[in-house]
Design a protein with these regions (language model features):
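Small-molecule-sensing regulatory modules
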Residues: 2-49, 56-59, 66, 85, ...
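Short, well-ordered beta-strand segments
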Residues: 6-8, 81, 99, 134, ...
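N-terminal glycine-rich phosphate/adenylate-binding segment common to multiple enzyme folds
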Residues: 54-109, 113-115
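A conserved helix-loop-strand patch within extracytoplasmic ligand-binding domains
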Residues: 85-86, 94-150
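Glycine/Thr-rich phosphate-binding loops of Rossmann-like dinucleotide-binding domains
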Residues: 91-92, 143, 186-187
């Protein structure tokens, strides 16, 4: 008998592409399983009347992208949920776990320029003074201002195509910064003008480029089905980054970057915390031997603890 798995997701084009990636994994490894994608509207979904206001921590911050989906998962309306892992809050509701990480895409941030600068600028250093960069990510804003304090930053909301149109079609700003992974999944990589180095220009958000599957911890049958979809290397790197974020208690307002790389069983993790205005930057790097998720979480937590000892409270409570 064919089994049907209900997969919950946001309704944006990117979210639906990512949900289809999970369906493709089921088709490959479990051809007898049928997937049903269930679109769920979340509090974080942008509407034109919202303007460019950033999501506030008081309103739920990152959790706004997941809470309605998680509520449906807890109720049993869906069997699992697909998320951009970087958008997941540090804490999950009781009984839910992130049990599977798909093969991770490119972790880097990409810059999209207004038409008047296309072909004339190929790096942050080359942007003219007073250039306006549109981003609602405090991490991206802080790194831009740390590297180029003579630039200006303005908030921007909306899905990926909307943000591109605001810069290219509506002249809202001179540039915007988006995750390259999302652009690639939407086949919009040709819109990219240049890519930022994840070590020297802009450390990515924790888990950027990773798609995760959230399930009920008690659902052993589904968790067994998900095992062949999990990418061990992506899982290790993402969990190390997430563990550091949890120790730092990073909110959606705290500018934090975390980037892990795995070479065999050697994990290299760099984590940075900045002040909102980019004038302060604190960084920690560790290398650890890891064989699985538990080791990765321990390494990430250790890096987070070392960094937390030197980061002023005002950088973590902004």
């Amino acid at each position: 008998m064919t089994e049907t798995i209900k997969i919950g997701t946001r309704g944006s084009a990117l979210a639906l592409v990512q949900a289809e990636m999970v369906c493709a994994g089921f088709r490959e490894h479990h051809p007898d399983v049928t997937c049903e994608i269930v679109e769920i509207r979340t509090s974080g979904d942008w509407k034109p009347e919202h303007g460019e206001t950033r999501l506030s921590e008081a309103d739920g911050g990152k959790g706004l992208f997941a809470k309605e989906i998680e509520a449906a998962l807890i109720r049993g309306d869906i069997d699992c949920a697909v998320h951009s892992m970087k958008d997941m809050p540090a804490g999950l509701p009781d009984g839910l776990i992130l049990d599977c990480v798909l093969p991770r895409a490119d972790v880097r941030d990409a810059v999209i320029l207004n038409g008047r600068w296309r072909g004339r600028v190929d790096s942050l250093d080359a942007l003219p003074k007073d250039t306006v960069v549109a981003t609602s990510s405090t991490r991206r804003a802080a790194f831009v201002l740390n590297k180029r304090p003579d630039l200006s930053v303005t908030p921007i909301r909306g899905n990926v195509p909307t943000r591109i149109d605001k810069v290219r079609g509506q002249d809202m700003a001179d540039a915007t910064i988006l995750a390259y992974a999302g652009l690639e999944r939407l086949r919009l990589q040709d819109d990219v003008d240049f890519i930022l180095d994840p070590q020297t220009d802009m450390i990515p958000a924790a888990c950027q480029g990773a798609v995760c599957i959230e399930v009920r911890e008690e659902d052993r049958a589904l968790r067994d089905l998900l095992k062949p979809l999990n990418c061990p290397e992506s899982d290790i790197c993402a969990m190390a980054e997430r563990a550091a974020l949890q120790i730092l208690d990073g909110s959606c307002k705290t500018p934090i970057g975390a980037y892990a790389m795995l070479d065999g069983q050697t994990l290299d993790l760099v984590v940075a915390v900045l002040s909102l205005d980019g004038t302060e930057l604190y960084k920690e790097r560790i290398t650890a031997s890891v064989t699985g998720r538990a080791d990765a979480i321990a390494a990430g937590a250790a890096c987070g603890r070392k960094l937390k000892q030197v980061v002023p409270d005002h950088c973590l409570t902004c």
